Amino acid sequence: MIDSAKETDRPKHRKRDEVIAFLILAVVIWPILSVAIVGGYGFLVWMSQIIFGPPGPMH
């Protein structure tokens, strides 16, 4: 009897864990990752312009 009660709780507990994992990914990880990627690209462009000069025709 006790084993069957634990088995019925597992799907609810597993679903709750999946919802928590989704919220952590959606609210914390993806925003941080997207800001890091865009910031990294901006830094790369900025450093390349410092080294090679601004874009445009050579005068």
Curated annotation (Swiss-Prot):
It comes from the Bacteria. Residues 1-18 are cytoplasmic. Keywords: Cell inner membrane, Cell membrane, Membrane, Transmembrane, Transmembrane helix. It is a single-pass membrane protein. This is Protein NapE. Residues 44-59 are periplasmic. Its main location: membrane. It is found in: Cell inner membrane. It holds the Pfam family NapE. GO terms for cellular component: plasma membrane. May be involved in mediating interactions between NapC and a quinol oxidase. The chain crosses the membrane at residues 19-43.
